Amino acid sequence: MQENKIYIPEEDPYFARPYIDVEEWRDTPLRHLYVHGGFEGTKKDGTEVKFCFYFPEKEKYEGRFYQYVSPAPEDEHESEHLTGEDDKISFALTHGAYYVVTNQGGFSLTDGERLFKSSANGAQFGRKTAQRIYGYEHRPFGYIFGGSGGSFKTMSCMEMTKGIWDGGVPYVLANPMATPNVFSPRVRVMRVLGEEGLKKIVDNMEP
C-alpha cells in the first residue's frame, strides 16, 4: 500500500503566485475588510483557484480564523448571501476571527488532491495577509469545518496536511443512517397520524 505523503504548501511551486485583486472595507453584514484573490497559473478545466477573506476590525480580532468547505466546490463568494444562523461570516467576525473560503479549485474528476491543496494554500496565504493587515508577526490559530460532503473534505484537509489547521469540525457525516430510507419513519407517522398528528409530535419535541 502506498503511503500518503503529508502535503506542505510552502514546498508546492504550483501555488507560488498568489495575488489580491480586491481589498476594501465593507459594512455588510458587519464592518470588515474584504480581500479577494487567487493563485496565478492554477487554472484547470476553466477554473482558477480563488479565495475570499473577511477580516474583523483590529480591536475585535483575537488571533484566529474559521475556514468553511462546502459539500461541492462552489463560488468563493458563496457565504455572502447567507443570513440568520447560516451567516458564517458574521459568526466569525463576532467571535474574534477572520473568515476564509476558497472555491476549492472547482470541480475536478481527475485530481482528488486539488481540494485540500487549494484549501491549505488559501489558509496559509490568509495567515500572511492577516499578519500584514494587523501589523504584527503571529500565527493565527485555524479551524476548518464542513457538513455533509464537506465533512469528508474537512477530514481530508486535516489528514493530508500538518500544521495548517489546529482543529476541524466535520458534521452530518454520510453513513448508513444518512441514507434516504431513514425518512421512512417520518412518512409512516404522517400516514398513520396525518399531517396534524405529525405537527403535534413536532410541537412536543421542540424546546
Regions found by a protein language model. Name each.
Residues 69-70, 102, 145-147, 170-171:
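Generic beta-strand/beta-sheet core signal
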Residues 95, 161-164:
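Short, structured coil segments at secondary-structure junctions
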Residues 151-162:
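Short glycine-enriched nucleophile-adjacent loop
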Residues 136-148:
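Alpha/beta-hydrolase fold nucleophile elbow
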Residues 165-207:
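A catalytic-pocket lid/entrance helix-loop region that shapes and gates access to the active site
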Residues 1-63, 86:
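Catalytic-loop region of hydrolases
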Residues 62, 67-135:
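Cap/lid segment of the alpha/beta-hydrolase catalytic domain
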